[in-house]
């Protein structure tokens, strides 16, 4: 941030770093951006001009070696964003507004720059199929459990990890939040050309919502789940070039 300490006033890079970015862009030379930061920054210009962006967070004393191994292809990156990268602060609620409207991937109405759960790798892993083992029904109790079986294949030439994610929304519950929410996930390692079936457990509690009295319960009767490598929205589909598979309860 502009003061190099404390809370940020905005999502911009410090002024000297903004100047560095613009100077590099002017050279016309292809470049990769490594972002070492503990929170979201404005990456809108880099999204257009940088050939790739590696979000390194705060990697520690040996982070430089790990970053170099990723950049030179010795390590295949497979991380997923645990936050949302917004396009800008424009349209965001005021800091003094404590409602959840437009905050986090669960309540956002506008499109993000990079969505929660998104991340690329050097691999090429596809989701072939996904289905609920046994009968798919809306749970009657929080203790009910479902197993989703997902079949994935590595079409690439090197070993790779992928994170299979399950998002869910109760479609006939007025208490439900606007967007599907992450309820389960599993990281999977595949060798080149390997095909693997993954079991992901979803509990009945994932179908619960909280009403206006603050009571959590099973208030709906129909739900839709989405299995894939990211959120079930158009932005993630464009960025990954892959579709999710919908399941119905």
Please describe what each predicted stretch is:
Residues 1-249:
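C-terminal non-catalytic regions of proteins with extracellular/luminal or membrane-system context
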């Amino acid at each position: 941030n502009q003061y190099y300490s404390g809370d940020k006033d905005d999502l911009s890079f410090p002024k000297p770093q903004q100047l560095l970015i613009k100077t590099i862009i002017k050279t016309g030379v292809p470049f990769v951006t490594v972002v070492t930061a503990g929170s979201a920054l404005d990456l809108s210009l880099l999204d257009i001009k940088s050939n790739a962006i590696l979000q390194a967070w705060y990697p520690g004393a040996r982070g430089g070696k790990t970053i170099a191994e990723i950049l030179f292809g010795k390590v295949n990156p497979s991380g997923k964003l645990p936050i949302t990268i917004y396009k800008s602060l424009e349209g965001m609620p005021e800091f003094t507004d404590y409602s959840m409207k437009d905050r986090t991937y669960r309540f956002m109405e506008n499109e993000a720059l990079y969505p929660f759960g998104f991340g690329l790798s050097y691999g090429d892993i596809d989701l072939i199929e996904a289905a609920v083992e046994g009968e798919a029904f809306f749970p009657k109790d929080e203790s009910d459990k479902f197993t989703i079986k997902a079949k994935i294949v590595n079409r690439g030439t090197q070993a790779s990890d992928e994170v299979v994610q399950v998002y869910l929304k109760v479609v006939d519950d007025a208490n439900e939040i606007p967007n599907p929410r992450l309820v389960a996930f599993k990281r999977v390692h595949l060798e080149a050309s390997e095909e693997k079936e993954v079991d992901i457990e979803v509990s009945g509690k994932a179908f619960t919502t909280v009403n206006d009295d603050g009571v959590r319960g099973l208030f709906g009767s129909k739900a839709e789940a989405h299995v894939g490598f990211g959120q079930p929205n158009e932005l993630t589909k464009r960025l990954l070039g892959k579709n999710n598979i919908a399941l119905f309860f």
